[in-house]
Regions:
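Right-handed beta-helix
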Residues: 1-63
């Protein structure tokens, strides 16, 4: 049986998995891995902010 931990206290929801977690809807998905990778996939991705929209990393590649 799959081992998934869920903790909800009315303020926040925490879902934990040991190796990888995928949230999927149609062609869109968010994947979180144990190694710390976060993968966003979809036919259209939008990032919007009323304040600063910051991208930080060891290196950042656009296009």
């Amino acid at each position: 049986p799959a081992q998934v931990e869920v903790d909800a206290d009315g303020q926040r929801l925490i879902v934990s998995a040991k190796e990888q977690m995928v949230l999927r809807c149609g062609k869109a998905s968010i994947t979180l891995t144990k190694a710390g990778k976060v993968l966003l996939e979809g036919s259209y991705v939008l990032s919007r902010s009323t304040g600063v929209n910051r991208v930080k990393g060891g290196s950042v590649q656009l296009n």
